[in-house]
């Protein structure tokens, strides 16, 4: 047995040496990528400097993929491993824990890009109990051309940093490809800017970023599969929904079966078309010369079949409940007293992250999602709201320590009650009131917390109001609400948390 083990080890060693020698022989980098868009973007940047390999081919669902031992070995033998985001390739964090980072360089294509909150991607017939894919954050950024450019730029910059001797080639290749992506972005912007119908209905909820960046609204629909007809009950629901919203097209991630297309056309009066999520290309697609840009051009053409037709805004089948406690809608009876222990911990002000631009992506998202203010206007609004010179607050069950101008001031506090405030929008908030027992507390004598909760619970972040006059005087402050998050979070992590909520 020992001889066999030694023989196998020797053969493995010889194999690895052979692979290493092969890499040295052609002088090219060995880059392993996860799924199609990552492969395509990396290949375009690396060009002839690398052998770029695709790990997850057509026919394999990237959301559900788990790497085999062979695939892991392939990654471990690479010079560079490129993936999109851990919310897409959920297996990557475990892999990275075992990877020899001195040998294999790793690139996360999304880099510091913030992601929108995820959700359930409904696929399959819900009458059969099939479930979609859940993402904590939505990873489908490659389906927006303007964000695809950012992915390419990050791959370019990462490869250039890792292999500076090839930087000029990477930059030249990336520039040529980005020019094509900019033309694609322009085609989308011009093609959709005058959309008569801004809502589109899709069976695969992967197009949120595309919709957001080009002024559209994705409406996801559940209980449909491209290769199976819905039940009679589901078909009746769809028929009512389609007619009520005057829906002309329902988009699938692949061609719907002729039987399904005929059924939907006959019973619901709606046509089907394809919006390709570009998670893979088939061998036939590749042979036909298809690529990211050509498929995205087809997606635009398909979308315009909806956007070029007049119609009312299409509402989701199930309306989202926005009147939650977190948004300021609650009964008085739900409001309970709280103690300082709810806020115990070490906290940092978010104001420095606003100043250094870390939150700029958050303001861009808010501007596009709400349409109420521009990115610059949101930044100005939050600059006033977050402004403070208290950089840190450390809280125990009965004390608060304020770090201001590099100096620490610590006082003991008692709980003195709560106050429900009604805002101009009609929603409400609760402030929980504390008062220092120290005579020299000065501007920190009176303190109020607001954290979007109305009953005892451990705060994840909070807004704080403090002053030396009275609690009543603090009730009048509505424009400045210094905000604090745990001090072990990075600015990037805080920004992502803000988007999540």
From Swiss-Prot:
GO terms for cellular component: plasma membrane. Pfam families: ZinT, ZnuA. SUPFAM superfamilies: Helical backbone' metal receptor, Lipocalins. It comes from the Bacteria. One of its GO terms (biological process) is zinc ion transport. A lipid is attached at residue 19 (S-diacylglycerol cysteine). It is a lipid-anchor. Zn(2+) binds at residues 63, 140, 204, 279. The keyword Transcription does not apply. Residues 116-136 are annotated as: Disordered. GO terms for molecular function: zinc ion binding. It is found in: Cell membrane. PANTHER family: HIGH-AFFINITY ZINC UPTAKE SYSTEM PROTEIN ZNUA (PTHR42953:SF3), HIGH-AFFINITY ZINC UPTAKE SYSTEM PROTEIN ZNUA-RELATED (PTHR42953). The His-rich loop facilitates the closure of the zinc binding site and is required for zinc acquisition. This is Zinc-binding lipoprotein AdcA. It comes from Streptococcus pneumoniae serotype 4 (strain ATCC BAA-334 / TIGR4). The gene is adcA.
């Amino acid at each position: 047995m020992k001889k066999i083990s030694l023989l196998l080890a020797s053969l493995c060693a010889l194999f690895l040496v052979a692979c290493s020698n092969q890499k040295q022989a052609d002088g090219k980098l060995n880059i392993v990528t996860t799924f199609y868009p990552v492969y395509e973007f990396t290949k375009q940047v690396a060009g002839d400097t690398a052998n770029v390999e695709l790990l997850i081919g057509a026919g394999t669902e990237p959301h559900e993929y788990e790497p085999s031992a062979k695939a892991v070995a392939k990654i471990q033998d690479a010079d560079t491993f490129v993936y999109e985001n851990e919310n897409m390739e959920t297996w990557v964090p475990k892999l990275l824990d075992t990877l020899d980072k001195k040998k294999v360089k790793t690139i996360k294509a999304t880099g510091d890009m913030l992601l929108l909150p995820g959700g359930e991607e409904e696929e399959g017939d819900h009458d059969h109990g099939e479930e979609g894919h859940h993402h904590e954050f939505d990873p489908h950024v490659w389906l927006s051309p303007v964000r695809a450019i950012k992915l390419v730029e990050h791959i370019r910059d990462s490869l250039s940093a890792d292999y500076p001797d090839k930087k000029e080639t990477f930059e030249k290749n990336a520039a040529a490809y980005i020019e094509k992506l900019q033309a694609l972005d322009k085609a989308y912007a011009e093609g959709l800017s005058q959309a008569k119908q801004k809502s589109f209905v899709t069976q695969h909820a992967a197009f949120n970023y595309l919709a957001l960046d080009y002024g559209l609204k994705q409406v996801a629909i559940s209980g449909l599969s491209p290769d199976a007809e819905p039940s009679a009950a589901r078909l009746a629901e769809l028929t009512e929904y389609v007619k009520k919203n005057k829906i002309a097209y329902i988009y699938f991630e692949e061609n719907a079966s002729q039987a399904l297309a005929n059924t939907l056309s006959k019973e619901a009066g709606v046509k089907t078309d394809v919006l390709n999520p570009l998670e893979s290309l088939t061998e036939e697609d590749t042979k036909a010369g298809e690529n990211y840009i050509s498929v995205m051009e087809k997606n635009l053409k398909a979308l315009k079949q909806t956007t070029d037709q007049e119609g009312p805004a299409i509402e989701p089948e199930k309306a989202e409940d926005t009147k939650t406690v977190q948004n300021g809608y609650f009964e008085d009876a739900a409001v309970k007293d709280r103690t300082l222990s709810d806020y115990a911990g070490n906290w940092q002000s978010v104001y420095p992250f606003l100043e250094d631009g870390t939150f700029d992506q958050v303001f861009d998202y808010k501007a596009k999602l709400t349409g109420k203010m521009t990115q610059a206007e949101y930044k100005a609004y939050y600059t006033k709201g977050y402004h403070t010179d208290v950089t840190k607050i450390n809280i125990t069950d009965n004390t608060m320590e304020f770090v201001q101008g590099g100096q620490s001031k610590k006082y003991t506090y008692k709980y003195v009650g709560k106050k429900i405030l009604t805002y101009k929008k009609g929603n409400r908030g609760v402030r929980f009131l504390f008062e220092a027992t120290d005579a020299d507390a000065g501007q920190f004598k009176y303190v109020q917390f607001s954290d979007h909760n109305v009953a005892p619970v451990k705060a994840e972040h909070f807004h704080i109001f403090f002053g030396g006059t009275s609690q009543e005087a603090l009730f009048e402050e509505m424009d400045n609400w210094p905000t604090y998050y745990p001090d072990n979070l990075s600015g990037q992590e805080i920004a992502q948390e803000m988007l999540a909520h």
